[in-house]
Regions:
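Single-pass membrane-anchoring alpha-helices
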Residues: 1-18
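Parallel beta-helix/beta-solenoid repeats that form elongated, surface-exposed shafts/blades used
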Residues: 17-222
Length: 222
């Protein structure tokens, strides 16, 4: 009767075959929030988003250009900045990039990158870059892993390993930078001729003001 039919129906639904997909191929994916705004862009390169501030020059002028003495000059510079990325871009509800993960990541909104950036970048809620971690690759194919933290003034604290063997911590400030680390002869980071293990202070023009080299101190004691 009715009970038998119901049981058959329940058992039938219980053993219904479920389709599974092992691979999904797509040129790009846009994930929206509950209000229909684009929030996550996935692709290689990432797809265009109508809600993204970085690709809307009207919003760029409104939010960022006004922070500079010459907004028109900033907009001219901005035309040359790279806004694309190969990976994932997370945006907040106002359309600002807050996190990027992947390869060939976007330029900062204050200047072009000198290297191809692979890794992760994070920004403030209004799109100003505040740090990142990953590998920077030069045009000639050399790679250098870095971890960086920025503040309102620019580069604040960076952990760097260069391809010439130099490795160190760079603390930047308004008047110059403090560099702590080690390097082989002719190191780029510490501008050293011989081996270096110690600390240096450079002014904001790149001139060496003071240093303490442990390698030199050790040689003098021998």
């Amino acid at each position: 009767g009715f009970v038998s039919i119901t049981m058959v129906a329940v058992l039938g639904f219980g053993f219904t075959q479920i389709d599974k997909f092992g691979i999904i191929r797509a040129k790009g994916i846009i994930i929206e929030d509950e209000n229909g705004r684009d929030r996550i862009l996935i692709g290689s390169p990432i797809p265009f988003s109508k809600d993204r501030v970085r690709t809307d020059t009207t919003l760029v002028r409104q939010y960022w250009a006004k922070q500079f003495k010459n907004p028109d000059q900033y907009m001219e510079w901005y035309k040359k900045y790279k806004n694309s990325a190969e990976g994932i871009v997370f945006m907040n509800e106002k359309g600002f990039d807050v996190v990027q993960v992947g390869d060939n990541l976007s330029d900062a909104n204050i200047g072009k990158r000198m290297f191809r950036s692979t890794g992760i970048l994070w920004n403030t809620q209004t799109g100003w870059e505040r740090g990142g971690a990953g590998v920077n690759t030069t045009k000639d194919g050399k790679s250098r892993p870095t971890i960086g933290l920025d503040d309102d003034a620019g580069e604040a604290l960076h952990l760097i390993c260069l391809e010439d063997g130099s490795k160190g911590i760079v603390i930047g400030g308004e008047n110059g930078s403090l560099r702590i680390g080690m390097a082989k002869k002719e190191g780029e980071l510490f501008q050293n001729k011989g081996k270096f293990s110690g600390i240096q202070y450079f002014d904001n023009k790149g001139n060496l003001i003071w240093e303490q080299n442990m390698d030199s101190a050790t040689k003098n004691k021998q």
